[in-house]
Amino acid sequence: MKSIYFVAGLFVMLVQGSWQRSLQDTEEKSRSFSAPQTEPLNDLDQMNEDKRHSQGTFTSDYSKYLDSRRAQDFVQWLMNTKRNKNNIAKRHDEFERHAEGTFTSDVSSYLEGQAAKEFIAWLVKGRGRRDFPEEVAIVEEFRRRHADGSFSDEMNTVLDTLATRDFINWLLQTKITDRK
């Protein structure tokens, strides 16, 4: 993508340069025609025209210099911004985010570890088939229908819960050798 922009920029510069050159050639040709001998040349007018031309050339060159200088300053500013962003500001932000995330991560890890320990302890005790107390609530949710269309969402939730319960019961009731 950058190469396309680069080629387009070069093309624009070439076209602009050719237009400026053709305009300069046209101006030089109009100046190179000598005035007829019958018309007297006024030296004061000739000097004013030369003066305006030299001032215009200086102004044009100076504006080109200022444009290139602005471009250099902009590139330098971009480079400095990128350096500062990568070194100081970004490191500070990452450090803060890391500290906040570490606490959250530690709490989450602790809670996950506790849940895993409780589940393993429950499996080791071998309670056998577990009756879920929420079975009654699940049956009631089956029968209930809402006018706002949440029936299908609740139906999916109920079916997921039933499938999970059946899977856990299957895990508890089958032997390890049967699962292979």
Curated annotation (Swiss-Prot):
The keyword Chaperone does not apply. The modification Phosphoserine is found at residues 54, 105, 108, 150, 152. It comes from the Eukaryota. Residues 26-56 are annotated as: Disordered. The modification Arginine amide is found at residue 127. Induction: Glucagon release is stimulated by hypoglycemia and inhibited by hyperglycemia, insulin, and somatostatin. GLP-1 and GLP-2 are induced in response to nutrient ingestion. The keyword Signal applies. It is found in: Secreted. One of its GO terms (cellular component) is extracellular space. Proglucagon is post-translationally processed in a tissue-specific manner in pancreatic A cells and intestinal L cells. In pancreatic A cells, the major bioactive hormone is glucagon cleaved by PCSK2/PC2. In the intestinal L cells PCSK1/PC1 liberates GLP-1, GLP-2, glicentin and oxyntomodulin. GLP-1 is further N-terminally truncated by post-translational processing in the intestinal L cells resulting in GLP-1(7-37) GLP-1-(7-36)amide. The C-terminal amidation is neither important for the metabolism of GLP-1 nor for its effects on the endocrine pancreas. Residues 1-20 form the signal peptide. GO terms for biological process: adenylate cyclase-modulating G protein-coupled receptor signaling pathway; glucose homeostasis; negative regulation of apoptotic process; positive regulation of insulin secretion involved in cellular response to glucose stimulus; protein kinase A signaling; regulation of insulin secretion; response to activity. InterPro entries: Glucagon (IPR015550), Glucagon_GIP_secretin_VIP (IPR000532). One of its GO terms (molecular function) is hormone activity. Glucagon is secreted in the A cells of the islets of Langerhans. GLP-1, GLP-2, oxyntomodulin and glicentin are secreted from enteroendocrine cells throughout the gastrointestinal tract. GLP-1 and GLP-2 are also secreted in selected neurons in the brain. Keywords: Amidation, Cleavage on pair of basic residues, Hormone, Phosphoprotein, Secreted, Signal. It holds the Pfam family Hormone_2. Residues 84-89, 131-145 form a propeptide. The record marks 52-53, 83-84, 91-92, 97-98, 130-131, 145-146 as: Cleavage. PANTHER family: GLUCAGON (PTHR11418), PRO-GLUCAGON (PTHR11418:SF0). Belongs to the glucagon family. This is Pro-glucagon. It comes from Canis lupus familiaris (Dog).
